[in-house]
């Protein structure tokens, strides 16, 4: 993609703070640094979002997450946890439409402005029958 910032980074047209690169992915520090070490793992191949991945692409890209995650853990002894996020579509807060995975280190006692919290549905919102119907609908799509 000609105007894709992540394609330009992957092609070496835009400099970045690269932490890892191979033939499939590039990983670099997010410019916003929600927390120290906030890293993006980006496929070099332009894939818009999770819905554009083949099984082979997904396997090749996502199997590299532990490598970067462990590097973050080893690099920052004060890291207490790690959020791994993949936003897909504008409604899900995807702002760069080239698939990427956020690895966001979390530190004890840090008020970093990052939050990930959702409220469970109110009791009774979904009956057992509703849940069975939802399950069947998804299963039908998986089974073809």
Question: Model-found features: residue ranges?
Answer:
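HIT superfamily nucleotide-processing domains
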Residues: 1-144
């Amino acid at each position: 993609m000609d105007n894709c910032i992540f394609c330009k980074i992957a092609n070496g047209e835009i400099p970045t703070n690269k932490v890892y690169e191979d033939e499939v992915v590039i990983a670099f520090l997010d410019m916003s640094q929600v927390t120290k070490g906030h890293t993006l793992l980006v496929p070099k191949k332009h894939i818009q979002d999770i819905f554009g991945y083949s099984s082979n692409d997904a396997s090749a890209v996502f199997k590299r997450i532990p490598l970067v995650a462990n590097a973050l853990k080893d690099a920052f002894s004060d890291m207490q946890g790690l959020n791994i996020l993949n936003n897909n579509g504008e409604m899900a807060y995807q702002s760069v439409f080239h698939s990427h995975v956020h690895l966001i280190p979390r530190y004890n006692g840090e008020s970093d402005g990052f939050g990930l919290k959702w409220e469970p549905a109110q009791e009774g919102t979904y009956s057992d029958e509703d849940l069975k119907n939802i399950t069947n609908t998804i299963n039908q799509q998986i089974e073809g």
